[in-house]
Amino acid sequence: MIKKSILLVDDDQRLRELLKDYLNEKNFQVFTSEDFDEAKEILGFFIFDLIILDRMMPTGDGINLIQDIKKVSKTPIIMLTAMSENNDKIDGLKTGTDDYLSKPFEPEELFLRINNLLKLYENVNNTELLFSFGNFIYNTKTNL
């Protein structure tokens, strides 16, 4: 089974290490970045199944990075941040983040949110492979 890949962007080194270890144990391949500039560089070379990012970091606001990502990709994004006010959550969701989780959080909750998003996006991607013509449905992946 191929491991799903996650890019984790957060300036908190301890949190990055803990989440990387936890998600590796859950059978994910996790790449980390400590700032948005590094994350943009990584995203220029690799495609990830999911991105987790902090909103406020020394190099900028995660909202801007989300907007850049969503212009070119359908990759699901979870915003993981200490900004927990309702208007912060609404701003994040308006810009295209797929889920919003406030710190502090339970790792299992993050794991469940990741799985739910990956299942949802997998189903969406699978339906894009189907074409119908009259009473016939053609699957472009299996050619059936």
Predicted feature residues:
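Active-site residues of response regulator receiver
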Residues: 54, 81
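Short hydrophobic/Thr-rich beta-strand motif most characteristic of the beta2 strand and flanking loop
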Residues: 27-36, 42
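Short, Lys/Arg-enriched segments at the junction into DNA-binding effector domains
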Residues: 4-5, 116-144
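Conserved phosphotransfer cores of two-component systems
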Residues: 44-46, 68-75, 95
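The feature encodes the CheY-like receiver
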Residues: 16, 58, 85, 103
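Acidic catalytic/metal-coordinating carboxylates
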Residues: 35, 61-64
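Two-component/phosphorelay signaling modules centered on CheY-like receiver
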Residues: 13-31
